Amino acid sequence: MDLTVGALPYPPGRQARHQPRTGETADSLNPDQIATDLDGPAVVSSGHTLRHSLLVRNLTRRELQIATNGQITAVVVDPATGEVVGGFAGAQAMPLLIVRISPGHADRIPLLIGTASFSPQLGYAVPAGKWGIRATLTLGPDPASSPRKRTPVMPLTITA
């Protein structure tokens, strides 16, 4: 029998069956084309999930299309190194919902922030402290072939 707590196997020391998707292979967004920010401070208790919003501003001269499942899922990063240390580890519905943003306009996209640890050294939940989050945006209507770009690291406070 395989048990998983959050994103990590139980008992500790076993190999995880599935590796979380972290968006590590995506390039960074061009800040001259797309600006992103949190819609207010992001504060969540360790071991819990926060539903927040990502503000996305289209600085280009063409419509921006972002493929989502109704939200974008962030990963938690160490702000000093950029290393992904956690995020959301549960199941999600996967409908294809395209967010369209006209040139020069902005929109709020729901943002899912989980605190399950992806690092055995941190335990099963990312501990309290000042962390960062970033999200990967799929820039086009086809999740399989559209380019993926990462947001800059944004501040996250995790409380006990």
Please state what every model-predicted region is.
Residues 34-43, 57-67, 71:
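Short, charge-rich amphipathic segments
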Residues 19-49:
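N-terminal edge beta-strand
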Residues 27, 37, 57-59, 94, ...:
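Preference for short coil/turn "hinge" residues that link or interrupt alpha-helices
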Residues 14-16, 27-31, 48-51, 72-73, ...:
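Short amphipathic alpha-helical segments, especially helix-boundary/capping motifs
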Residues 50-58:
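Short, well-ordered beta-strand segments enriched in hydrophobic/aromatic residues
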Residues 61-160:
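Extended, well-structured beta-strand/loop surface patches
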Residues 1-31:
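A eukaryote-biased signal for short, well-structured alpha-helical docking elements
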Residues 11-14, 43, 157:
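Intrinsically disordered, low-complexity segments enriched in proline/serine/threonine
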